[in-house]
Amino acid sequence: MKKFTLTLLLIFGTVSALFAQQSVREDIFAFLKCEGYVPTFDEDRDILFKVQGINYYAIIKEVADMDYAYVEVSANFTADVLYDKLLAISNDQNRDKFVCKCSAERDGEDNCFKVAMEFITNNRTNTEYQMAHALRLLPGRIEKFKEELD
């Protein structure tokens, strides 16, 4: 009986986490459409949308054994700049910044940078608030990063 009860609890937890993830994904998609963006899904079911001609991704991940989802809203770029310079710019941009973060990475031969905001959410109100906040902050952070590249 204990095994049966434990199995039911595990199944319920997994199903509720999947519903939470799906709900957050639907909330973000609906919010973006309502704000006038044209969101689509990529091959991983991440949400892709454009802001001022720049591709943004909303990546939703379930948090095991919890009733919330982790969301990363980001824009990725390839830069014809030395990796060390990208890393220095990222570190400089991240000083005294707590919400939007910049990172540098190597992708094979390419040097790349990413500007992202992360949050956790478990309801539509919080999801919409955080997405609006991301859409306010990220374009400015991206612009500042690009200015440093010149």
Where are these regions (language model features)?
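Sec-dependent N-terminal signal peptides
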Residues: 4-15
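Sec/Tat signal peptide C-region and signal peptidase I cleavage site
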Residues: 15-21
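Extracytoplasmic/secreted envelope proteins and their assembly/folding machinery
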Residues: 25, 29, 83, 87, ...
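Ser/Thr-rich, low-complexity intrinsically disordered terminal regions
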Residues: 30, 34-81
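Short, internal acidic amphipathic alpha-helical interface segments
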Residues: 72-112, 116
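Ampiphathic alpha-helical segments that act as solvent-exposed interaction surfaces
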Residues: 92-96, 127-150
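A short, solvent-exposed beta-edge/loop patch
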Residues: 102-139
